[in-house]
């Protein structure tokens, strides 16, 4: 499974980001530009995933890692963001609400 750090994510601007947290978590604060597709609904929303490579984030990295493993098994080019949104916030990066 491919992974990147929040610092590497911060340096990227051209790779789509899918946030697999639940809607209430996402609306409380998320990485700017992220699209919310909760892990609990991911299987029903595969058509909403970006074409090509994309990153996947959650709060700490566990849910996104599970999502990436499942998506890779289906042929998607997904990369896990280690540390998740919690690490993003701890690094002092901006969030959207």
Outline where the language-model segments fall.
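Rhodanese-like catalytic fold shared by cysteine-dependent sulfurtransferases
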Residues: 1-16, 20-55, 60-97
């Amino acid at each position: 499974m491919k992974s990147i750090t929040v610092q590497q994510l911060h340096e990227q601007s051209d790779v789509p980001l899918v946030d697999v947290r639940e809607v209430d978590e996402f609306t409380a604060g998320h990485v700017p530009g992220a699209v919310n597709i909760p892990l609990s609904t991911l299987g029903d929303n595969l058509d909403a995933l970006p074409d090509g490579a994309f990153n996947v984030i959650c709060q700490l990295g566990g849910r996104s890692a599970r999502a990436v493993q499942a998506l890779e098994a289906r042929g998607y080019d997904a990369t896990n963001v280690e540390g998740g949104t919690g690490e993003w916030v701890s690094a002092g990066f901006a969030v959207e609400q």
